[in-house]
Amino acid sequence: MTVVLDTSALLKRYLSEPGHDLVSQHLKQDPVWCASALARSEVQLSLHRVASGPVEQRELWSTFREDWDRIAVVPLDERCLARSVEIGANFRLQIVDALHLAAADRLPRPLTYLTFDSHQIPAALSLGFEVASTESAVALL
């Protein structure tokens, strides 16, 4: 099965916080990892912000780059941009959330969508994705 990671899920891979083990488990089980092209910039900027200094930033970025090299990147082309508007309008999402979902929507099913953004979960479920998140129970109430 394919695992699609949004930025919130990718960040959990590098930070010791709730959700880290869930992400690690899915990445060990599934050989195909995908993410939108936007995720790279978002993750690197976020890792820069949380790093305690330049040494930790370099270590985090290095680990991320190793992972990024094995991630199948979904481009944010015209088709994806147009689909993100539809998804954003239908589910009242911010553009960044809609872009991640539109990128995932281009991939063959079945797929597991990893996110820790509670705004994305209802849309992901409606799009037919299996969702893995510690937020899933909250979103389904």
Question: Where are the predicted features?
Answer:
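Acidic catalytic patch
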Residues: 62, 69-91, 98-101
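Alpha-helix capping/helix-boundary segments
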Residues: 9-10, 39, 80, 100, ...
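Short active-site oxyanion
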Residues: 1, 30-33, 70-72, 108-112
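Short beta-strand scaffold positions
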Residues: 5, 34-35, 75, 95-98, ...
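Short, well-structured N-terminal submotif of metal-dependent ribonuclease cores
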Residues: 1-38, 50-62, 129, 139-141
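Acidic, PIN/NYN-like endoribonuclease modules and their adjacent C-terminal/linker elements
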Residues: 2, 40, 105-141
